[in-house]
């Protein structure tokens, strides 16, 4: 059984759950600090974010706020998830805990930091550097040789 613990039971978490299924995860659970949330995308919410270290399985933080994402991710090991419909050059480096959504194009010699979100339909062209915990929004296009800092 391939288990993924998604930290953050909201819209972003729902999209990550879909990507996880496409990547072969067959046991998905969520953690969230809102005790009123019991299910997300048809999967159970089994506890709060502080329990992440104790729960077995691969982990990913699905929280849009960069500061919160960094704080949670700094205390745990996380996986990187890439939607199978993303087009990524063989010469791309993607950091731990980052998520690449459907329809994304990432071209040659791009470096993406830890905990980043490269959202649906975005493109990052050649020789770019994307800092840690940065969000490239839905449909955004980053021209070649750009550098974007951390927590943007």
Identify the meaning behind each predicted range:
Residues 1-49, 53:
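Hydrophobic, well-ordered beta-alpha structural blocks that scaffold small-molecule cofactor pockets
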Residues 11-12, 66-68, 124:
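Short alpha-helical
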Residues 8, 59, 78, 125-126:
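Generic structural signal for conserved hydrophobic packing positions in ordered secondary structure
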């Amino acid at each position: 059984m391939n288990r993924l613990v998604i930290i953050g039971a909201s819209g972003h978490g729902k999209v990550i759950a879909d990507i996880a299924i496409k990547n072969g995860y067959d046991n998905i659970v969520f953690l969230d600090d809102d005790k009123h949330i019991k299910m997300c995308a048809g999967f159970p919410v089994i506890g709060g974010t502080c329990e992440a270290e104790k729960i077995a399985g691969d982990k990913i933080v699905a929280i849009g706020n960069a500061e919160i994402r960094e704080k949670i991710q700094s205390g745990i090991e996380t996986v990187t998830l890439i939607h199978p419909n993303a087009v990524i050059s063989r010469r791309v480096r993607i950091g731990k805990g980052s998520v690449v959504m459907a329809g994304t194009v990432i071209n040659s010699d791009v470096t993406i930091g830890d905990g980043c979100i490269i959202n649906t339909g975005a493109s990052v062209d050649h020789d770019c550097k994307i800092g840690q915990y940065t969000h490239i929004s839905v449909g955004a296009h980053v021209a070649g040789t750009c550098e974007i800092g951390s927590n943007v």
